[in-house]
Amino acid sequence: MSRINKNVVLALLTLTSSAFLLFQLYYYKHYLSTKNGAGLSKSKGSRIGFDSTQWRAVKKFIMLTSNQNVPVFLIDPLILELINKNFEQVKNTSHGSTSQCKFFCVPRDFTAFALQYHLWKNEEGWFRIAENMGFQCLKIESKDPRLDGIDSLSGTEIPLHYICKLATHAIHLVVFHERSGNYLWHGHLRLKEHIDRKFVPFRKLQFGRYPGAFDRPELQQVTVDGLEVLIPKDPMHFVEEVPHSRFIECRYKEARAFFQQYLDDNTVEAVAFRKSAKELLQLAAKTLNKLGVPFWLSSGTCLGWYRQCNIIPYSKDVDLGIFIQDYKSDIILAFQDAGLPLKHKFGKVEDSLELSFQGKDDVKLDVFFFYEETDHMWNGGTQAKTGKKFKYLFPKFTLCWTEFVDMKVHVPCETLEYIEANYGKTWKIPVKTWDWKRSPPNVQPNGIWPISEWDEVIQLY
C-alpha cells in the first residue's frame, strides 16, 4: 500500500511539473517572444504597413512621375492635414528611414496630386507609360475657358483631370492652369457619355465637383512614408482653401451679345475711368487681403462683371461688399496708409455701416457692410442731410471666386438673384440715371438716426 502511494505521488508530481513546463513554454511563446520580437523586428527596420494597396499605388505613381519628370505635388486634404499635425517629424525624416507607414496607408479611395500644366512637357508619353506600368487611366478634357472671349480659339480643349487606378486605389491628378490674376485654376470634372460611371466612386472625389481657384502655392520636398514628395510649404493654407475654392466664369458669350446691342463706350474718358477703376480695385484688394478681410464685388461693379465682363464706364465708382463679422477696426487706417483718404463714414458697426474712400482721378471706393438675418441679408444706407436710414435686402448668398480685370476676386455665387434684387428683372438694360434711395427694387425705409448720434453715424470729410 505504501509502495502504491509513493508511485501515485511520483506520477502526480511528474504530471504537475510537465503542466507547469508547458505553461512556461506557452507564456514565453505568446507573450515574451511577441514582446521581444516586436522590439527586435523594429530594431532591424521592419516596415509596418508598407504592403497596403494605397501605399503601393502612391509609390508606383511617384516612380512614374519622377522618371518622366512630371512635376506633381500632393494636394490630398486628408494626407496634408496629417502631415501638418506631424510636420516636425516629417521634416526631420530622411529617405528610407521610416519604419511605419503613417500617412499614405490611411484607408481611403483616392490620393490627390496636382501639377501645373505649363510645366508639363510630355503629356502623351506619360499617359502611355502609366498604362504600361499597370495603371488604368482616364483623361477628362474640356474647352479652355480662358479662350471663351476669343471666337477663333473658343473650342480649344485642354486636359483637366486624370484618374489612374491601380488595383482598388486610384490617383486623382488635378491639372492646374495659370490664369491672368497670377493664380491657379482647375476645371469641372464632367463625365462624358462614353465614360464608365463605375470606373471609380466619382462622388467621393474632393476636387472637380466644380471649377476651383487657388493661390499659387510655394512648394517644398519632404519624405513621407519613405517616399519623396512635393507638398505646399504651408499645408494648412491649401487645405483651408479647398472648401472655399469654387470658381465661376464671367459670361463672355452674353457679354459679346450685350455689346452687339449696346455699343461699348471707347471714348477717352471711358478708357481713362476704367483704367483708374481697375487700379483702385487692385489697391483695395491688396489692402483687404493684407488684413485678411474677405470681400466681393457689389452693386454696379458686380453688375458690370456679370453683364459685360468689364467695368461700367458711367458708374464713376468701385463697389465692394464685406460681411460685418469680418470688419476690423484698422480697415480705415489701412486704406488711408494705402493712399485712400476717408471720404465719408455712415452708420456704425452695429447698424448700417458704410465707408467711402477717395481714389485718384475722382474715382470713389464704396465699401458696404452686410448683415445677416434669419432668411435674408441686408446692407444699409444713410442720407447725410436728413439722417434717414435705408435698408437694401438680398436673398442669402455664398461667395465664389471669379476673374475680373485680370484679378481673382469674389462675387456672390448666386449672382443672378443678387443682381435682380438690386436692379430688378430689367438689369440687362443700361440705366445711366440712378437714384440710390428710390431706384433699387430692394430698398426700403429703415427709420432715422437720432440727432444725438449724428456726430458718430454721419461723418463727412
Swiss-Prot record:
Any one Gene Ontology molecular-function term assigned to this protein's record: phosphotransferase activity, for other substituted phosphate groups
Example GO BP: nervous system development
Biological pathway: Protein modification; protein glycosylation
Cytoplasmic side: 1-7
Transmembrane segments annotated in the record for this chain: 8-28
Region (Required and sufficient for interaction with POMGNT1): 6-27
Annotated keywords: Cardiomyopathy, Congenital muscular dystrophy, Cytoplasm, Disease variant, Dystroglycanopathy, Glycoprotein, Golgi apparatus, Limb-girdle muscular dystrophy, Lissencephaly, Membrane, Nucleus, Signal-anchor, Transferase, Transmembrane, Transmembrane helix
Signal peptide annotation: none
Sugar-bearing residue positions: N92
Coiled coil (residue ranges): none
Listed Pfam families: FKTN_N, LicD
GO cellular component: cis-Golgi network; endoplasmic reticulum; extracellular space; Golgi apparatus; Golgi membrane; nucleus
InterPro entries: FKTN-rel, FKTN_N, LicD/FKTN/FKRP_NTP_transf
Tissues where this protein is expressed: Expressed in the retina (at protein level). Widely expressed with highest expression in brain, heart, pancreas and skeletal muscle. Expressed at similar levels in control fetal and adult brain. Expressed in migrating neurons, including Cajar-Retzius cells and adult cortical neurons, as well as hippocampal pyramidal cells and cerebellar Purkinje cells. No expression observed in the glia limitans, the subpial astrocytes (which contribute to basement membrane formation) or other glial cells.
Membrane topology, Lumenal segments: 29-461
Main location group: Golgi
Catalysed reactions listed for this entry: 3-O-[beta-D-GalNAc-(1->3)-beta-D-GlcNAc-(1->4)-(O-6-P-alpha-D-Man)]-Thr-[protein] + CDP-L-ribitol = 3-O-[Rib-ol-P-3-beta-D-GalNAc-(1->3)-beta-D-GlcNAc-(1->4)-(O-6-P-alpha-D-Man)]-Thr-[protein] + CMP + H(+)
Entry EC number(s): 2.7.8.-
Record has Manganese as a keyword: no
Subunit structure: Forms a complex composed of FKTN/fukutin, FKRP and RXYLT1/TMEM5. Interacts (via transmembrane domain) with POMGNT1; the interaction is direct and is required for normal POMGNT1 location in Golgi membranes.
Function: Catalyzes the transfer of a ribitol-phosphate from CDP-ribitol to the distal N-acetylgalactosamine of the phosphorylated O-mannosyl trisaccharide (N-acetylgalactosamine-beta-3-N-acetylglucosamine-beta-4-(phosphate-6-)mannose), a carbohydrate structure present in alpha-dystroglycan (DAG1). This constitutes the first step in the formation of the ribitol 5-phosphate tandem repeat which links the phosphorylated O-mannosyl trisaccharide to the ligand binding moiety composed of repeats of 3-xylosyl-alpha-1,3-glucuronic acid-beta-1.
Disorder: Muscular dystrophy-dystroglycanopathy congenital with brain and eye anomalies A4: An autosomal recessive disorder characterized by congenital muscular dystrophy associated with cobblestone lissencephaly and other brain anomalies, eye malformations, profound intellectual disability, and death usually in the first years of life. Included diseases are the more severe Walker-Warburg syndrome and the slightly less severe muscle-eye-brain disease. Muscular dystrophy-dystroglycanopathy congenital without impaired intellectual development B4: An autosomal recessive disorder characterized by congenital muscular dystrophy and evidence of dystroglycanopathy. Features included increased serum creatine kinase, generalized weakness, mild white matter changes on brain MRI, and absence of intellectual disability.
Stated name of the protein: Ribitol-5-phosphate transferase FKTN
